Amino acid sequence: MRTWYFSEMAYHPAWEKGLARGSLRVNFPSENMDPREAGTLLNRYLDEFALCDEVGLDIMVNEHHSTATCMTVSVPMALSIIARETKTARLLSLGNPIANRPDPVRVAEEMAWLDCLSGGRIEIGLVKGAPYEIAPANSNPGRLMRRYWEAHDLVIKALSTTTGPFSWEGEFYQYRAVNIWPRPIQQPTPPIWMTGMSVDTGIAAAERGHVVGTLLSGGLAKPMYEAYRKRARELGWTAGPDRMAYAAIIGVGNTREEGLRRANIIADYVRTSPVVAEPFTNPPGYNSVAANVAMLKAGPRPHRMITDRNGVPIDHRTATVEQFMDTETVFAGTPDDVFNQLKAFNQRMGGVGHLLFFGQGGELTHQDAKANISLFGKEVAPRLLQLEVPEQVAAE
């Protein structure tokens, strides 16, 4: 199991005002932040990413827009800085919200450029984007997945074509001459990732051989992984753990109490992330008819719910760190505690090859974040690399 550190790079000083307004995203005015303070935080967060390279961790960066929960507005921009400040860490963009961008060829150019700059260390996430990203992108949710798959195919073709310009005449994108310079070091393309938490996502990723990742989804991850493995077998190949990724909040300390304290602070991201004005939570057409029917049948739920290992639902907004641990969205304690929790999780999931380590969030201090990264990198991550493939998967 490889470990990829990430942080949302939040502007947490504005959270109290956003919570009072009932929305931290889309319609929360930027007058509630101090640009100089934002700059100080961004430089601090970049220092924490650089530390990962020193302790043997890989790095993941994501992006969001019009929100106090994430100040990374451009994955390529952040990764270009990190690529210059690191030497060995692999760098994952998770990801590029291609359905919300008008320029998939530009995405391919940016990723190829980063692959050259980093010496071939880039991995590429092509993601759908959250529902509250639709309004800032001025995007049509009803056509989202059609745009996504066309952009996906165009990005991959642009990255992998080296024999001269090709034209593209699609439903949403038209180009006379696609011919990206420079081309990526990793051929035909750097590794491609997708994200989601549904069986359909698992099947779609398996059909393309992509890595599939899921964020803070608890038990919902296992059916997606199983669907991936099943579809791969139907297509005549075996999907190993290296095709599966899982993102979780992790707090490590010299004592169990210290680890839980750090995890509890980081978990404030999960408690605040769903706080968005209702019109932006489920834009018409964003979810399928079947998904909307299922949500209606489940009854009114103002915020996304997850369940613990006994099927008991918890509310993100009010859950304790112990409740989050019961859902396996949080792992916390001493290095031994965290390793044993992740080892058991890996066994239950049938083998997960990539751990996305949410190691900083909320008001966690710079010193706490550095200690969390260092302890995990030195005392947990090396042992995770030695985890064996669960028996039931190895036998398939």
Question: What kind of region is each of these model predictions?
Answer:
Residues 1-89, 190, 394-396:
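N-terminal beta1-alpha1-beta2 module of alpha/beta enzyme domains
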Residues 3, 52, 63, 82, ...:
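Conserved, mostly hydrophobic/aromatic
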Residues 60-78, 97-98, 130-135, 216-218, ...:
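Glycine-rich, proline-tolerant flexible connector loops at the mouths of alpha/beta enzymes
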Residues 27-43, 95-105, 186-196, 250-253, ...:
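Active-site mouth loops of central-metabolism enzymes
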Residues 3-7, 59-61, 91-94, 122-126, ...:
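Hydrophobic faces of well-ordered beta-strands that scaffold small-molecule active sites
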Residues 197-219, 223-224, 229, 243:
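A conserved active-site cap/scaffold subdomain adjacent to cofactor or substrate pockets
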Residues 4-33, 54, 145-181, 221-349, ...:
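An alpha-helical appendage that flanks or caps ligand/catalytic pockets
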Residues 50-54, 79-88, 111, 115-122, ...:
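Acidic (Asp/Glu)-rich catalytic clusters
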